[in-house]
């Protein structure tokens, strides 16, 4: 069959049109490639949101049913949820120091509350500040000694705009004065106190700190920023502004199954408080839930600001807490012990383009692992002295050969304990004797000591060996405690 021949001028027009189309296509492809290259090289913003004394089970993304937390859950849905993330030491100052430095408490040297962070510590914020980031911090710091509230500590540790950083306290109402921010509730002597004093949606601590965060984000639309906001709630006192104060007054508060356990099921390092009863839990928890709800609503305001500014797709967002709150579990309140409610904390991370949405990280991690993981995602070099591990492969869904163990330690106030934790087991050695092994799969409420079971010997030996290696590598003096040393040696078959 002969081919149809177009007139010569039509062929020329067709060729010209083809060239124009090809040129247009090449232009689009070039611009797309340039845009992708720009996006790939454009540095991430870093936003760290920290709460205080927060039980992970109050969040929807960790199975909580009472408080709806859609904004915190959004972070989990669009990033990664770490299900076995622990406070390196489950009290305020040591945990916070470990998070910002990547070092264990004995190296910060914040081993207890109110100990100042060492002058030589280089935080993640300092690294990013040197890189050219605009950096800032608002909320509770608790790493500058005894000052209370002590606004804007002189030592900034890389958080350049620290006007709204205060060192200590769980204040409920803030305001501005000619001298700067102030606690806006005072006792009869004129000293700041923890009362609500009519705090509203503008002056209540959570709302006020969220607004400072929003202002910083809006001010830094065109330059990479690193900002950390540390909300003092839901730490006690259990009070919250209207309408959150009555939102959960009629809810049926679940009572922990461990609240009235027998003494035989209670380690010496965690004696129960006989004053803590089911009625105590019913009284305290509705306001605790209200604080969590207020936090979630304000985190929603912060996320909406990132969306409005088109920064949401270029910002690493981290949500975590410094430690948990037992909320009546094991007949105790607050923290300080290696029980799950005290030591296990929420940890969520969004990193657009690198962390797949909906990732679940089950392996055990602790606060010291945050900084190495963050810098693996941002491409920054770690400063000297960091002791944590880069877990970015886990968060990117590629960590098949991860060494599943984290190490926890007590404060330097009182009798020491050391713990090795995996996603299933928790082994605790204490100066008070009688090591404890919890199987979190078969005993999630931590009621039974599996240390004496014959079938536990292999995991006890392995975790003890790992704990000894950790102590040697990181110069942890607790391993030298006479009782702990003897119990570990016996578990390893080294006892005389």
Segments from the language model and where they lie:
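Short, Lys/Arg-enriched N-terminal segments with co-localized hydrophobic residues
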Residues: 13-21
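Formylglycine-dependent sulfatase
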Residues: 23, 29-30, 38-430, 435, ...
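Positively charged n-region of N-terminal signal peptides that target proteins for export
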Residues: 2, 20-25
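Short arginine-rich
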Residues: 472-475
């Amino acid at each position: 069959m002969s081919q149809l021949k177009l007139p010569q001028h039509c062929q020329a027009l067709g060729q010209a049109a083809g060239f124009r189309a090809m040129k247009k296509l090449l232009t689009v492809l070039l611009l797309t490639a340039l845009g992708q290259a720009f996006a790939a090289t454009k540095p991430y913003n870093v936003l760290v949101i920290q709460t205080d004394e927060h039980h992970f089970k109050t969040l929807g993304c960790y199975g909580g049913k009472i408080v709806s937390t859609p904004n915190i859950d959004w972070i989990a849905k669009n990033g990664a949820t770490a299900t076995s993330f622990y406070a390196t030491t489950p009290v305020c100052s040591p945990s916070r120091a470990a998070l910002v430095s990547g070092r264990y408490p004995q190296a910060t040297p914040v081993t207890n509350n109110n100990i100042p962070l060492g002058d030589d510590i280089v935080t993640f914020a300092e690294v990013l500040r040197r890189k050219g980031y605009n950096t800032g911090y608002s909320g509770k710091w608790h790493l500058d000694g005894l000052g209370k509230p002590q606004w804007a500590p002189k030592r900034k540790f890389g958080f350049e705009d620290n006007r709204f950083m205060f060192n200590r306290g769980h204040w409920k109402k803030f305001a501005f004065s000619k001298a700067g921010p102030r606690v806006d509730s005072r006792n009869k002597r004129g000293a700041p106190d923890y009362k609500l004093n009519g705090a509203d949606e503008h002056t209540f601590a959570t709302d006020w700190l969220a607004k400072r965060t929003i202002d910083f984000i809006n001010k830094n639309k065109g330059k990479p920023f690193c900002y950390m906001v540390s909300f003092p709630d839901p730490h006690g006192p259990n009070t919250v502004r209207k309408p959150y104060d009555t939102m959960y007054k009629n809810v049926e508060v679940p009572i922990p199954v461990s609240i009235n356990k027998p003494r035989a099921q209670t380690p010496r390092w965690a004696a129960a408080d006989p004053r803590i009863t089911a009625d105590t839990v019913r009284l305290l928890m509705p306001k605790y839930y209200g604080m969590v709800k207020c936090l979630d609503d304000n985190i929603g305001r912060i996320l909406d600001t990132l969306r409005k500014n088109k920064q949401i797709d270029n910002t690493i967002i981290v949500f975590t807490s410094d430690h948990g709150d037992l909320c009546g579990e094991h007949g105790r309140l607050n923290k300080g012990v290696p029980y799950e409610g005290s030591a296990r904390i929420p940890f969520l991370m969004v990193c657009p383009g690198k962390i797949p949405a909906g990732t679940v990280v089950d392996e055990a991690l602790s606060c010291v692992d945050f900084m190495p993981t963050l810098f693996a995602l941002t491409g920054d070099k770690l400063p000297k002295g960091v002791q944590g591990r880069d877990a970015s492969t886990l968060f990117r869904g590629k960590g098949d050969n991860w060494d599943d163990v984290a190490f926890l330690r007590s404060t330097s106030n009182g009798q020491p304990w050391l713990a090795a934790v995996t996603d299933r087991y928790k082994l605790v050695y204490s100066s008070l004797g009688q090591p404890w092994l919890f199987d979190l799969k078969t005993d999630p409420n931590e009621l039974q000591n599996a240390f004496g079971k014959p079938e536990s010997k292999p995991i006890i030996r392995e975790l003890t060996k790992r704990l000894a290696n950790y102590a040697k590598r990181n110069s942890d003096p607790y391993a030298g405690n006479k009782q702990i040393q003897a119990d570990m040696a016996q578990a390893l078959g080294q006892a005389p």
